[in-house]
């Protein structure tokens, strides 16, 4: 496939005539020099030609095209020239895009729209004699014959299909399973197919394109589009394709949405309308617009409705000066500290402060509004606030008058609506102030702003150059959404400025052009609405009346300092700007540590100009993880074993090191050198052996001395040498023993014939019975052997079974020997491994946000709580609040007033980034990536290690597992937070505990099934001002974050790398994997076609036992022909670096090997001919290296031959002393007894 230009469909109206275009445009090539005057004349001629022939006619007005005037007939002589030109054009090659246009015509003829409510909801196409329609697309096919076809549902593929009528079967599209990477044809342009996925540029295609086919250049259907998912700059398509067998396959990228054009409907007074076309707009009917938004606040398309009610239709387009915060109004709120002194009602009350960003920036919500002028239109240089003076009008001022501070001044980064974004120094409080002339309004709240840093090194300021790590910061764009804040219509609030007391009379004085509602109790209760200065009859004191105005065209924030309007519930919501978004942040890199290597250990010399974290873990079964923050210059010692050690210094990458069996002394030297060497390598065993040798020598010496002393004592005793000696008793006893000999076979049969004939015949039947049983076994097995012999000739693969260590990167080498064939070298390497457990998502938890709605206050009456589905919803009614007039609610009654206080919790706005997922972990499945080299062929494959599931690569078939040891770094319960995994025994779903992990739970972040228990307790309000006091437990999520310990990424054993999405442990080095391989016959070479080695001998030139290939050997050989031979080490003591080599008739080859033993005696084969190599290896010079050992150390090779000789000599000497003593003792005893 190849790219092609996007198609242009014929316009509704004729386009302007194209300008003249030279078919052979001038190019930058060498031309002969022309005089300047000739060049100027030529340029002038070209300019006149451009003005004459390249003029475009003006755009035609909308409507039917104007009639063309009849042009005069052109002279006849010009016609032949036109024909000539036309003939020349026909001789040219077809212009590019012709096949694409043909495909598009096929697509338009064989694709039929699906209509729903008069709109195209999707498409159906006829492919291979069948009608195919996406299952999620509702409506009727716009074709009478196809609309009558009965369709069958295939929900697995999101399709409906049926046979097309007989008269249409010959006129359908054909499908194909051939999809080479490249570009394909679609209705909206080119579709790229790469890595098994169809993608288009983002913004191409969308709702209503479901069911459109993707065609190749021959007009065959490659796929049918069902939907798509945005992935950055491109959109991945969800499609239905076919495989080589014609079976349907559905390929759905993660996060894809179906592309059916379903019109989103909203409701207004039981009448539905499209959400993108509301019947009202805010500029024309503000109160009605708020009614529409409140009625559809829970509609999934609320954001679409909110966006469109701000756009009023007009005859000409103009820049919009309204946005979502135009619907709102600033307000006065109760601030605990005004100007760092007493509490007050402040025009810039701080409602919330968020400090979840990793770069130290904070997001503040206040009662003023930023980016708007006094009228409420957008103006980035202004802000507006509610004045506390007189009539509480809304005023505006310059954004330069806004100041934010903590322990020092803050830098403002952005603003929108009620929200500010600022960069602040650390502090214990946050202050926002308005400086206007000599007056200043400020509000201070207690909030600890900590110094933030990312990574493993603390820093005050991010570096200019460093390492980039993942972090989360507040997005400076105002259009991003971090969630919603709830809004409501403001309730009535009385102002004293609306009352005037003069000469014992009371007047209602509304602002100019405003209506004011009054309530008076001057004997009788009276109420009304006035717009001009009005006298209240019978009233003598201003405190007998209250006057207020209620604006139902604006929303205010759902603040606990405001009374909720009695006619409206809390239903509005607006977006919170400055979303917390993932990005990368620069972090510093500490000085690289200096490493000193010693025997089985390292010393890290560290220099840190700032607090830097050092973590370590062992790569064996016991991780023994450590963590330490280091400042200044220091050194740390760590022991390193054969299993390895991993350390991470600051923001540097992890470093893994392994110990070599290096030690002073010489395992092949003198006894003192041998003792020094083995004492450093194996101190305990060396001490035990030395103690045993010393004890043997001591026992031998003592025994020999005792025997000699006893013999001397016996010989020198006078009475023991008496005359008339007799024969010793021991010799006399030997004379009493009768000589015996066994009877022959003939004598035995003769004895049985004359004495016991039945037993004779029984003895003769035993061999006969054995022969009968053997022949019967052969007769039973003969059919199986015959079948096996027949099938043996038909087998096309040779099965080889072996066991491979599950250590990524360490190859396992074997030699496959098959009768009649030359040996085949086999190398198996575990390239990667993934231990993926099956998980069950229990719930999602994060920091909760407590919502305190504006209270409901009823003067001279009572209220009742109602049930609610909100999480941890608490409601209480308090009586006797805000007594007669001087209370915050300004009620006329004394003790009959009531307040309904509510509280509930929800997920914090930044939970989309900072949250934890609680998972239950079950059985894990191990999947390994293998690299198998047999002969000259290399194969890569992935297979599950379960002993059942086969893996294949071309002609190679592999069955792996089950693994020798069951292991998983995950406990039964794990918690995932920001990509880090913790083993944590979290509470079950629904078993919430206040102040503990899981105090707020939900199935997902956007779910509505939130449950919580945070111990909210509502308190009775004081009488001074409207408020909702409460107490609550601390966030359990924040407590867990501060005490969660270290993640599994730093503490997992066996060097596992823990990853998420999905949860898995990668490259864990543990256990052994049994593997059965079916090697194809083509890989083997018959013995008659390969060289035969006649003689071979091995000489070891040099040997250093280490993790590297420190040994070198030479094979002297004689062969019958020239060719290639496999070489292999048949012992686990050593492994060869080379797998094959070239041999001649007579010659030698040099090979390299790796061993971990001082005495490496191993068998090497060349083309199947074996020989033994004896290597006395020296210890390596490097104590610590950066790669693991390739072979393990064995006991028989751990002790050198020289050491065995010295050890046996010592034991032999000790035993010789004992033997000498015993000989002396026996000789003396015999002498004494003889003389007696």
From Swiss-Prot:
Q: What class of enzyme is it?
A: hydrolase
- Protein's name according to its UniProt entry: Structural polyprotein
Q: Which Gene3D superfamilies match?
A: 1.10.287.2230, 2.60.40.350, Alphavirus E2 glycoprotein, A domain, Alphavirus E2 glycoprotein, domain B, Alphavirus E2 glycoprotein, domain C, Tick-borne Encephalitis virus Glycoprotein, domain 1, Trypsin-like serine proteases
> Position of motif Nuclear localization signal?
67-70
Q: Which GO terms fall under biological process for this protein?
A: fusion of virus membrane with host endosome membrane; proteolysis; symbiont entry into host cell; symbiont-mediated suppression of host gene expression; symbiont-mediated suppression of host toll-like receptor signaling pathway; virion attachment to host cell
Ranges where the record places region Host transcription inhibition: 37-70
The record's catalysed reaction(s) read:
Autocatalytic release of the core protein from the N-terminus of the togavirus structural polyprotein by hydrolysis of a -Trp-|-Ser- bond
Residue ranges for the region (E1 fusion peptide loop) are 881-898
Q: Which UniProt keywords apply?
A: Capsid protein, Cleavage on pair of basic residues, Disulfide bond, Eukaryotic host gene expression shutoff by virus, Eukaryotic host transcription shutoff by virus, Fusion of virus membrane with host endosomal membrane, Fusion of virus membrane with host membrane, Glycoprotein, Host cell membrane, Host cytoplasm, Host endoplasmic reticulum, Host gene expression shutoff by virus, Host Golgi apparatus, Host membrane, Host nucleus, Host-virus interaction, Hydrolase, Ion channel, Ion transport, Lipoprotein, Membrane, Palmitate, Phosphoprotein, Protease, RNA-binding, Serine protease, T=4 icosahedral capsid protein, Transmembrane, Transmembrane helix, Transport, Viral attachment to host cell, Viral attachment to host entry receptor, Viral ion channel, Viral penetration into host cytoplasm, Virion, Virus entry into host cell
Q: Where is the Peptidase S3 domain?
A: 110-259
The EC number on file is 3.4.21.90
Q: Which residues carry this modification: Phosphoserine?
A: 108
